[in-house]
């Protein structure tokens, strides 16, 4: 199915550019569009530029604080919580973005810990998910199906949510 390809074949290492100025410009273009982790930026730059050039440009972007993996991890964790993702699903998503385990743990601790009122944001998200998506199954008495669906989504509090609803 050739019509699905982007039309570009991967470049061989000897075909990749070593021009740091062009790589820097490309990095700025990518970062202007969306925030990226250092791993994501490196992967995208490495498609057109050599490994050394890509690594140098990423290091420069980190040094200039255009890229901050801790900030990216926390921002992404907030977005995942808003999307009603479990802590486990959020951790997996952040790992796929190329973030270090320490940054992931720190971001998840900041976002998913209970607030001063004692309310657990992950439990609230699970309850909202149950109320929205699985209300009809609960009304039909199929709590087992709801709990199984929550377990597939990586929830650990599904029993408490099932009893509350």
Tell me the role of every PLM-derived stretch.
Residues 1-163:
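An alpha-helical, amphipathic repeat domain used for nucleic-acid recognition
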